[in-house]
Regions:
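Structured segments of extracytoplasmic/periplasmic soluble domains
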Residues: 4, 32-39, 48, 69, ...
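Short hydrophobic alpha-helical segments used for membrane anchoring or interfacial signaling
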Residues: 45-53, 198-202
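Juxtamembrane extracytoplasmic/periplasmic/luminal helical "stalk" adjacent to the first N-terminal
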Residues: 1-34, 38-43
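GAF sensory/regulatory domain recognition
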Residues: 49-109
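Solvent-exposed, extracytoplasmic
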Residues: 28-32, 174-202
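Extracytoplasmic/periplasmic ligand-binding sensor regions of membrane-associated signaling proteins
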Residues: 88-178
Length: 202
């Protein structure tokens, strides 16, 4: 982030109202998000900025965001051909040769989402706590269980999101991962618990 801000003669406060800067930041976040998917073996990785994704539209209605998905995290695909762009501008799709998800959106639009807790909870927790850079992002991390990004999504998601902030404590976005609930159920089968009243503790 620091390099992108420096190259664009910008400050972190500019994220709040500069849609063009935000799209530049997101384009540079593509590789880190791909690495997150591969290293964590998850279906989704996303970053949502604390600023607008469209010119002349406030962040509260259309936030700048990049949301990637793979339906098969355990398989290898050359040139990341398994990845879908769920949220992100077309320029990112063209630059990285990404197929668009069936319900693709250019920005994170809360009014179109079935549930926004994966963003709202860590975002508001950090703001309300007047968080400082001395604490770890995980102090405001939030697990969201069995939700869907959009009502028409086929798979229920489990997500984990944390706030992003700089050394002075300025909140500039949310970073998170997601995986299909059915994937977790497949590796933690209920049959393994037997009849003894056991349970899985996550």
């Amino acid at each position: 982030l620091a390099d992108t801000l420096h190259e664009n003669n910008a400050d972190i406060s500019d994220i709040a109202d500069n849609a063009h800067l935000n799209q530049t930041i997101l384009a540079n976040m593509y590789s880190p998000l791909v690495n997150l998917i591969r290293q964590m073996n998850v279906n989704d990785a996303y970053i949502i900025l604390n600023g607008p994704g469209r010119e002349n539209e406030p962040a509260k209605t259309a936030r700048a965001a990049l949301y990637l998905r793979t339906n098969a995290p355990n398989n290898y695909y050359p040139k990341n051909s398994d990845l879908l762009l769920r949220i992100g501008v077309p320029a990112i799709s063209r630059k990285y040769n990404l197929a668009l998800d069936s319900y693709w959106q250019s920005c994170f639009v809360p009014s179109l989402c079935a549930d926004t807790d994966f963003f709202d909870q860590p975002y508001n927790a950090y703001l309300h706590s007047q968080g400082t850079a001395n604490a770890a992002p995980s102090d405001w991390g939030y697990w969201c269980m069995g939700r869907k990004l959009y009502e028409h999504d086929a798979a229920n998601l489990m997500t984990y999101s944390v706030p992003l902030y700089n050394a002075s404590g300025t909140l500039w976005g949310i970073l998170g991962i997601g995986f299909f609930q059915q994937n977790l159920e497949s590796v933690l089968p209920a049959a393994d618990l037997g009849d003894g009243g056991g349970a899985w503790l996550l």
